[in-house]
């Protein structure tokens, strides 16, 4: 179930698309009794997205749409088709960079928020095209002489990450089940988006 809406009904504002999986992702947040945890999660995610927006503003990139899904928030830009590779990579990595900076700045003072920020950084650097790290890899692989071999290696890496996450759930308990489930869903989504 997907629904879309626009902010302010004007074409100059970005289109917002909300996927049902996003609602499934955030629903458990409202079940948490500790409001600080909810605020920490929203802060970490908000600053991550602010990092992308700040880099886009610095490069003069216009935002066309925002897609909220269970995998996170994807910002779709107005592309001319001739964007420099380095500019795209900087924009993609600016979100995880903000999370890493937040982790370094808050490490000892606010360890819970710092660890959430580090987790967001590492999650977003996973090699799935819906995430920042995977999008960077897609940019680097596309058009490469060894594109087919690199895509196969990337597919194997994704499967290995899922297997590792399953082993971690087995060894360390169900607290890691959401991460393993997210990696499994990303693997399935990746498979569907690259199938003929």
Could you say what each language-model-derived stretch is?
Residues 1-196:
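Hydrophobic transmembrane alpha-helices and their immediate loop junctions
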